[in-house]
């Protein structure tokens, strides 16, 4: 009896028809993926991407060389050298380096910063061809901040009620 049932199923190609209808059902549904890099999905305001140093609206850099980000970094990826105190009593960094090879994108540096100087921006497309390009110095970090400032400020404003 089992062989007759199997012969009938194979004669009418039941498995093929079931598979075909299953494929057609998914063919007409909305796609679950995007055609990256031509389309990009939504990015959360809390996304932790490429690091950036921010400036005040008058152009002065925000970092006050408190070194809290360097102290809290679990990967020890941040190196800061502070310059001498200025006449008004504030300090600024002479050297601010981040080794992105070591960085684990935990966001502790951003949370520790009292003036929101170091942030993890919205950029997730920063592939490189050499390892040396992943050592960010102060100039590169400030350039990232200048490039992404509008989006960074918007993301921080959206996240402000939860901080």
UniProtKB/Swiss-Prot annotation:
Annotated [4Fe-4S] cluster 1 binding sites: 63, 66, 69, 113
Q: How is the cofactor bound?
A: Binds 2 [4Fe-4S] clusters per subunit.
Q: Can you supply a Gene Ontology BP term from the record?
A: aerobic respiration
* Sample GO molecular function, one term: NADH:ubiquinone reductase (non-electrogenic) activity
Q: How does it sit in the membrane?
A: Peripheral membrane protein
The alphabetized UniProt keywords are: 4Fe-4S, Cell inner membrane, Cell membrane, Iron, Iron-sulfur, Membrane, Metal-binding, NAD, Quinone, Repeat, Translocase, Ubiquinone
Is Cell membrane set as a keyword in this record?
Answer: yes
The UniProt entry, under Pfam families, shows: Fer4_7
The record's top EC class is translocase
Q: Which reaction does it catalyse?
A: a quinone + NADH + 5 H(+)(in) = a quinol + NAD(+) + 4 H(+)(out)
Subcellular location, principal: membrane
Example GO CC term: the record gives: plasma membrane
Q: Where are the transmembrane segments?
A: none
- Cofactor(s) required, per the database record: [4Fe-4S] cluster
Query: What range(s) does the 4Fe-4S ferredoxin-type domain occupy?
Result: 53-83, 94-123
EC number(s) recorded for this UniProt protein: 7.1.1.-
Q: Where does [4Fe-4S] cluster 2 bind?
A: 73, 103, 106, 109
Localisation:
Cell inner membrane
Q: How does it assemble?
A: NDH-1 is composed of 14 different subunits. Subunits NuoA, H, J, K, L, M, N constitute the membrane sector of the complex.
Explain the purpose of this protein.
NDH-1 shuttles electrons from NADH, via FMN and iron-sulfur (Fe-S) centers, to quinones in the respiratory chain. The immediate electron acceptor for the enzyme in this species is believed to be ubiquinone. Couples the redox reaction to proton translocation (for every two electrons transferred, four hydrogen ions are translocated across the cytoplasmic membrane), and thus conserves the redox energy in a proton gradient.
What does the sequence similarity comment in the record state about its family? Belongs to the complex I 23 kDa subunit family.
Q: What is the name listed in the Swiss-Prot or TrEMBL entry for this protein?
A: NADH-quinone oxidoreductase subunit I
Source organism of this protein record: Allorhizobium ampelinum (strain ATCC BAA-846 / DSM 112012 / S4) (Agrobacterium vitis (strain S4))
